[in-house]
């Protein structure tokens, strides 16, 4: 399991203390959304592996020339790799939409070339997408990518053996459609009515599995069945809006942590996921819930108790689904 380290706040602890908090909780993977030299340097010798993001503003520049990508790699990857920091993934932007999304693939290609030239080809380059890059998401087997550019990205990921990074939020699907989606089903709790995918017979007992398998179905239809999904963000707010309570947030995030060892009905086995987020971020724009996704307050006190080791759940029931809107 990993945890996303966002910094849209004015009251967060020093970077080194953040890394110490990750280590003390046994969190072995970190996602950051831009190059933070202090945080990356603090990872040296920590055993924590990094998903490093480019900013969305970087993407057009990286797409524009190989030399820009080469400069970015030499400034932002090579020094830290040489110092012993394990960078696993580079995320080319986060939830880029509209016309800017057309630059993602060129930026990924240039970064792949720059990494290979720097003998850093083991670092996988991808992009982090919103769930709504797919449409027809229920039943999961009917899902397809909504835009042609995603088909091209999927095929490129297959050619480089890189995963698709997907931000998957049952919270938003549930809060947008509580009439049809039950809270237990959205939060990994027992008692949810299983729902069968008529397209392939698989049965779903939680919304997260259905959403991830919808991504897999879209990848298959794009001609990229070998691409695995890494859940690059998932979480539940503890305050600020509908169903946003510490109890629900704890149920969801603990359920997610316990769940990742078992995979989904379509892709059983270990999966990789990053909880959003480490801290409540008091300067995040948008709805009030956006400022309450943290596992910890800025003073490092937990918002609710989480066991990061996980392991509570039984394996996935592979013959067992529930509907959800296209969020």
UniProtKB/Swiss-Prot annotation:
Q: Which residues are glycosylated?
A: 317
Q: Which reactions fall under this protein's catalytic activity?
A: Hydrolysis of (1->3)-beta-D-glucosidic linkages in (1->3)-beta-D-glucans
The record's annotation in InterPro entries points to: Glyco_hydro_17, Glyco_hydro_17_plant, Glycoside_hydrolase_SF
The record's active-site residues are: 95, 233
**Major localisation:** other
List this protein's GO terms for biological process. carbohydrate metabolic process; defense response
GO terms (molecular function) for this protein are: glucan endo-1,3-beta-D-glucosidase activity
Annotated protein name in UniProt = Glucan endo-1,3-beta-glucosidase GIV
* Organism the protein comes from: Hordeum vulgare (Barley)
């Amino acid at each position: 399991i990993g945890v996303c380290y966002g910094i849209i706040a004015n009251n967060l602890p020093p970077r080194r203390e953040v890394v110490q908090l990750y280590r003390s909780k046994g969190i072995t993977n970190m996602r950051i959304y831009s190059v933070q030299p202090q945080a990356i340097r603090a990872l040296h010798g920590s055993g924590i592996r990094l998903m490093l993001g480019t900013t969305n503003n970087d993407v057009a520049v990286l797409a524009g020339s190989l030399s820009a990508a080469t400069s970015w790699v030499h400034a932002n990857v090579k020094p830290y790799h040489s110092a012993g920091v394990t960078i696993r993934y580079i995320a080319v932007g986060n939830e880029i939409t509209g016309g800017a999304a057309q630059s993602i693939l060129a930026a990924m290609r240039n970064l792949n070339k720059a990494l290979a030239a720097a003998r850093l080809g083991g670092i996988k380059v991808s992009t982090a997408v919103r769930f709504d890059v797919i449409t027809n998401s229920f039943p999961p087997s009917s899902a397809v990518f909504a835009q042609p550019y995603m088909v091209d990205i999927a095929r490129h990921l297959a050619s480089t053996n890189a995963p698709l990074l997907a931000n998957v939020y049952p919270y938003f699907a549930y809060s947008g459609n509580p009439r049809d989606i039950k809270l237990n089903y959205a939060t990994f709790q027992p008692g949810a009515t299983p729902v069968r995918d008529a397209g392939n017979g698989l049965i779903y007992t939680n919304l997260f599995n259905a959403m991830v398998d919808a991504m897999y179905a879209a990848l298959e239809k794009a001609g990229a069945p070998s691409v695995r999904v890494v859940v690059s963000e998932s979480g539940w707010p503890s305050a600020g809006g509908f169903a946003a309570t510490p109890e629900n947030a704890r149920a969801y995030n603990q359920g997610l942590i316990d769940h990742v060892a078992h995979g989904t009905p379509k892709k059983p086995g270990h999966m990789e996921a990053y909880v959003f987020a480490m801290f409540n971020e008091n300067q995040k724009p948008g709805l009030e819930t956006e400022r309450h996704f943290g596992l910890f307050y800025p003073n490092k006190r937990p918002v609710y108790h989480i066991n990061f080791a996980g392991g509570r759940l039984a394996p996935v029931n592979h013959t067992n689904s529930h509907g959800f809107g296209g969020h």
